[in-house]
Amino acid sequence: MARFISKRKDGKDKDKDKKANRPLFKRRKFCRFTAEGIKTVDYKDIELLKDFINENGKIIPARITGTKSRYQRQLSTAVERARFLALLPYTDLH
C-alpha cells in the first residue's frame, strides 16, 4: 500500500517545515522574584531592573520573562519611579 506524502504546491514537504521552525530547546520559565525570595521590588536596585528592560528601554512582558503578575506590577511601578528619578533611561537614545 502506498503512503500518501503531504506536499505543498512548491514541492516541499510540510512536515520538514514544521520541524525546522521548532526550537531545539525551550527554557522553563520561572519567577525570579519568587525563586530568590524577594518580597518587594525596589526602584533603587538598578541592576535587577536592567534585567527586565530590553535594549530599547521597554519593560519585557511577563509572558516572556515568566514573572508572576504580582511582581510584574511591582516591577513596572519600580521602573517608572527609577525613570522619573533618572536612575534608568526612558529610551535607548539617552
Curated annotation (Swiss-Prot):
* Source domain of life: Bacteria
Q: Which PROSITE patterns match?
A: RIBOSOMAL_S18
From the Swiss-Prot or TrEMBL record, what is one GO molecular function term? small ribosomal subunit rRNA binding
- Which biological process terms from the Gene Ontology are attached to this UniProt entry? translation
Family annotation (Pfam families): Ribosomal_S18
Gene3D superfamilies recorded for this chain?
Ribosomal protein S18
Bias (Basic and acidic residues): 7-20
InterPro entries tied to this protein: Ribosomal_bS18, Ribosomal_bS18_CS, Ribosomal_bS18_sf
Can you supply one Gene Ontology CC term for this chain's record?
Answer: cytosolic small ribosomal subunit
Q: Which UniProt keywords apply?
A: Ribonucleoprotein, Ribosomal protein, RNA-binding, rRNA-binding
Disordered: region residues: 1-21
What PANTHER family does this protein's entry cite?
Answer: 30S RIBOSOMAL PROTEIN S18 (PTHR13479), SMALL RIBOSOMAL SUBUNIT PROTEIN BS18M (PTHR13479:SF40)
Please give the family membership noted in the entry. Belongs to the bacterial ribosomal protein bS18 family.
- Function according to Swiss-Prot or TrEMBL: Binds as a heterodimer with protein bS6 to the central domain of the 16S rRNA, where it helps stabilize the platform of the 30S subunit.
Q: Subunit details for this protein?
A: Part of the 30S ribosomal subunit. Forms a tight heterodimer with protein bS6.
Protein name (database record) = Small ribosomal subunit protein bS18
Write down the species.
Nitrosospira multiformis (strain ATCC 25196 / NCIMB 11849 / C 71)
